Amino acid sequence: MINSFKAEFHCFVVAHNNVDDYRICELNVGNELSSLLPYFEQFDTYELALARVPVEFRPNDEQL
């Protein structure tokens, strides 16, 4: 099942499964994020979104 999240304002969204899969996406107003991951959390800044992701699942510098 594909879940979706539609941005109402510019934001960063953490999509995750509460276990070991976390994705951070930047969305603008009206843009939609579709994912197989069941949970979406919205944050105002990338730093706040990154803080939500457990340390062991955060991207390293080469992935940014």
Q: Regions from the language model: what does each represent?
A:
Residues 29-64:
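A short, charged, amphipathic alpha-helix used as a generic interaction element across diverse proteins
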Residues 1-33:
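Short N-terminal "domain-start" leader segments
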